[in-house]
Amino acid sequence: MKKFLLLLTCFVSFGVLAQKAAPSPAAVATQKVGNTEVMIKYAQPSVKGRLVFGTKEAKALVPYGEVWRTGANEATTIEVSNDITVQGKTLPKGIYSLFSIPGETEWTIIFNKEAKMWGAYTYKEANDVLRVKARVSEHAHTEQFTIGITAAGQVTLDWDKSSVSFYLK
């Protein structure tokens, strides 16, 4: 009887642990832009009272001027089913990691051919396929990092009080 109760307790404990939400849950943004299917896979970190974007000296979670995985956990990926233009520059069809270099007024958006990596720890600039600039605008507070795509091709990165957009065509 004691073994049975111990076993039952273990199963219940594992069940409770399995219900705990991930700190940075996985998310997917998909949209058809013209005749191209676009899918962005990313993880959604939360602000949780922290300074998100800022200087390294201010201990920002994502320091200005440094390569960021554009999400949490594994590097964010973007898949396009056909060649497409990003801010007027051609991106061949394929799967890419999506990195960014945040700045106070402008970000660099990076499409890198190494699609499978954890974070930006092994990021190599030599593998960049395309880099484009995107403007930052102030935005209502967004607790959880969110990527959206419209049918018109606007990709929006929203987190904390920042919103960054770039365009696919």
Predicted regions and their residues:
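Bacterial Sec-dependent N-terminal signal peptides
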Residues: 1-21
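Targeting-peptide/extracellular-domain and disordered-appendage signature
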Residues: 19-92, 97-169
